[in-house]
Amino acid sequence: MTEDPKRWSQPFAALLGAYAAQIGFGLPSIGGKDSMSGTFQDIDVPPTLVSFAVDMALEQDIITPELKKAGNKLVWLKIERDENDLPVYDAVMDQYGKFMEDIQSGKIVSAYALDRHGVAAAVSKMAFGNRKGAKIEHNVDKRDLFAPAFGDIIAEVEDGKVGELAITYTEIGEVTEEPVLAYGDVKIALADAQDAWTGTLEKVFATKSAADSDAKVEEKLFNTSDIHICSHKIGQPTVFIPVFPGTNCEYDSARAFERAGAKVITKVFRNLDAEDIRGSVDEFEKAIGQAQMIMFPGGFSAGDEPDGSAKFFATAFRNEKLKEAVMDLLNNRDGLALGICNGFQALIKLGLVPEGKIVEQNAKSPTLTTNRIGRHISKVAYTRIASNLSPWFNNVHVDDIFSIPVSHGEGRFVADEDVIQKLFENGQVATQYVDLNGDPTMNEEFNPNGSYHAIEGITSPDGRVLGKMGHSERRDSYVGINIYGQKDQKIFESGVEYFK
């Protein structure tokens, strides 16, 4: 650990500043960690303070930063500062209170908190989201465009409502339809500005692989009237959600099923010792016997070790007790099975998709492998319903397109061409990644993992087992409010209705 007082003075001064802000705003701090003591021999930890701030608000009061509509005005809320350029906290609290009033009344529709990069960076980032342009007026001094302005806010205001604002503001420009950033005679195409911003670290953290392609995928849709009908009706079906070490989507999955009207049984697979494992197998077997559906949730079971995703998941369900219980649910009780993300990986490894039964994998078996970019991806993808074979999609139509979150490191669907063609012919290709025109594509902006034939989800031969990468369970009324498009595939409602 270094004894250099200058190195220690930097985080110390930052902590004093953070403490002053806490006192000024009347806010508490929760915990802290000293990592500078990690400096050892040739390992050097630079003097750094990292702060995370969390607030609570009503869902309907949340706004997002991207520009919404051409013609809307841009205003600059400047906080009051003292002779040392520090916030006058009482005045700032009053300004922020009025700012919240303007949000609640619907006058302010987007906003961005300024930082060390100033107005130009803030307006640019606001423009990138919806590819709306922005014109900044000359009343903004060019020296202020890139000057730090901590605490200030740039807000987008509904056209015609600027004069009704409760906040004290300076009007600085407007939103334009043309995707251009303009200041006086200077005009920069939005695409060029975004490339300059995101391209800085492209060589270090690539956003596209060398194999990225704009190649289109042959369109093959499957419509059938021969959809499996349940012969074991029940008023309120039960779903069993097994939880393994590393699973992290069980709460979202349970909430989605409960909202759809199902009973939920959740059990954790304990593996501290042999007795725990035997007990967990018995509990899982009993839960499957009580359920009409089983859902394998997303996450990183066993940390995706050893050497691959969902191996722990699949190994557990190859236990004879669990194997027989699952096949009894499917074969004798007309049950359903669903796997999302890590759960899809488990279904693939078990053979439940595409075979519809637990079997050993062979050289012709499809698999889900590392994303083409070689790392984890997390974004919203557009997926299209390619087949109506599955009861899980009874409430949607072939060719419907949805905006679905994806988050995985191994989601690239790979199989031999003859296997894929057979899946299409049987209607087992359930969903595909598509571009803005609704066409399946190999472009990584839309097919983020590089799946063959843009395949996002497949089913068993009769459609009762569905595996997909996209997290349909994460949909909620106020989740992703700035993401456009249909988000609810009604998978969970369809699963429940299948038994009624």
State what each model feature region is:
Residues M1-A21, K33, G97, L322-M327:
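Thiamine diphosphate
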Residues W8-F12, V45, F128-R131, A310-N319, ...:
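A glycine- and small-aliphatic-rich helix-loop capping segment at beta-alpha/alpha-beta transitions
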Residues P11-A13, P28, D34-A149, D159-T238, ...:
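Intein/HINT protein-splicing elements and their conserved insertion hotspots or analogous self-processing inserts
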Residues Q22-I23, Q41-V45, E66-K69, E101-Q104, ...:
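Solvent-exposed alpha-helices and their adjacent loops that cap or buttress functional pockets
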Residues I30-G32, A53, W76, S110-A113, ...:
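General beta-strand structural signal in soluble alpha/beta enzymes
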Residues I154-E158:
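Short hydrophobic/aromatic beta-strand micro-patches
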Residues I172, R278-G279, E283-F284, A325-D328, ...:
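Amide-donor transfer/coupling interface in amidating biosynthetic enzymes
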Residues G184-I340, F344-E355, T369-I377, M442, ...:
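N-terminal beta1-alpha1 cap of cysteine-dependent amidohydrolase-like domains
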